[in-house]
């Protein structure tokens, strides 16, 4: 079999120039988040809400509290430490970055009655 007839240099250049040109990437304008105006100190209303509503949450982290109560994360973390000291919530997991808390579940009256005779 004879070798195929090759393209000339000129034909190769034309083929390279006309085809397979990539379009330049258009950078989309990123959607910027609005700057948060979270409070950096507890006021009476927010502190009362922290003490009444937060112990009812199933999963409690500083970032969740910050989002829901519109306070700074550092203030939320300090508030959660205080609630933990007062035994209103329980620490589940602790790392250098964040702490995870949960509510304290009260034992049902039937379970408490059954546990009392066993202790005697």
Curated annotation (Swiss-Prot):
Protein name stated in the entry: Small ribosomal subunit protein eS25
Transmembrane segments: none
Residue spans of biased composition, Basic residues class: 19-28
Family of the protein in this entry: Belongs to the eukaryotic ribosomal protein eS25 family.
PANTHER family assigned: 40S RIBOSOMAL PROTEIN S25
Any Pfam family: Ribosomal_S25
GO CC, one annotated term: ribonucleoprotein complex
Keywords, ordered alphabetically: Ribonucleoprotein, Ribosomal protein
Positions of the UniProt region annotated as Disordered: 1-32
InterPro entries registered for this protein in UniProt: Ribosomal_eS25, WH-like_DNA-bd_sf
Highest taxon above the source species: Eukaryota
């Amino acid at each position: 079999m004879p070798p195929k007839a090759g393209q000339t240099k000129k034909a190769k250049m034309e083929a390279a120039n006309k085809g397979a040109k990539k379009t330049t990437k258009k950078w989309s304008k990123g959607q910027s988040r609005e700057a948060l105006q979270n409070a950096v100190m507890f006021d009476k209303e927010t502190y009362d809400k922290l003490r009444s509503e937060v112990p009812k949450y199933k999963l409690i982290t500083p970032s969740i509290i910050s989002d829901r109560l519109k306070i700074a994360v550092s203030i939320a973390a300090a508030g959660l430490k205080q609630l933990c000291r007062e035994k209103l919530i329980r620490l589940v997991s602790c790392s250098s970055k964040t702490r995870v808390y949960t509510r304290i579940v009260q034992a049902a009256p039937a379970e408490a009655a059954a546990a009392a005779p066993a202790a005697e």
